[in-house]
Amino acid sequence: MSETETSHGASIRKRPMQKRAQERVERILAVATQMIAEAGSDQLRMSDVAARAGISIGSLYQYFPDKAAIVRTLAEHYNEAGRDCICQGLDGVSSPSELEQAFTELIDEYYAMFLSEPVMRDIWSGTQADKALCDLDLEDARANAQELAAAMLRAKPARDPDATASTALLIIHLGEATMRLAIQMPEAEGRRLVDDYKRMALRELLD
């Protein structure tokens, strides 16, 4: 398999059970993260990852069939971190004022994370061009929307659950689109876009 072929949705080939194997996978991902931060995922080569990680190319292929699998695994890790952040941020919401504060803080934190994480920016920028990453992105958006919808219903129990679920999914999707646009712009302009998004989203959240 060439280094430019994709695995059509595969991430890590096998989940390591032994500590030594787990440490090897962590080292591979750490090296890949560093290389993407340096030159972008387009320049990532399996042979270079293996060399910098200090393993043979055969050992690398035991865990990852191609570079797309490495990128997908990194995307999964970032999505998990983002979902944990959302769950923690919305967990205590029980009123409209708490929802407004929690949502505002989450968006600010999310934007700051994108500004400080070049690898996350790189992966997100390529999401729409990669079917597997696009599917993963939709799965992540649905999971995050469920958390947001639950918080919206706690804040305002009289809401219609189905309408709330649709609204939450749109808010999450538009938030992701806003982040993608904002990180391509000068920071001051990007910040204004994020602030505009917050105002628009809060109108729907608190309606």
Residues covered by each model-derived region:
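Hydrophobic alpha-helical bundle segments that form small-molecule/ligand-binding pockets
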Residues: 93-96, 118-122, 131, 141-168
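Hydrophobic/aromatic-rich alpha-helical bundle segments in the mid-to-C-terminal region
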Residues: 134, 154-200
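N-terminal intrinsically disordered/low-complexity leader segments
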Residues: 1-23, 184
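Amphipathic alpha-helical segments used for helix-helix packing
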Residues: 113-132, 149, 177-183
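Hydrophobic alpha-helical connector segments
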Residues: 73, 87-115, 171
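Generic hydrophobic, amphipathic alpha-helix propensity
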Residues: 21-32, 49, 74-85
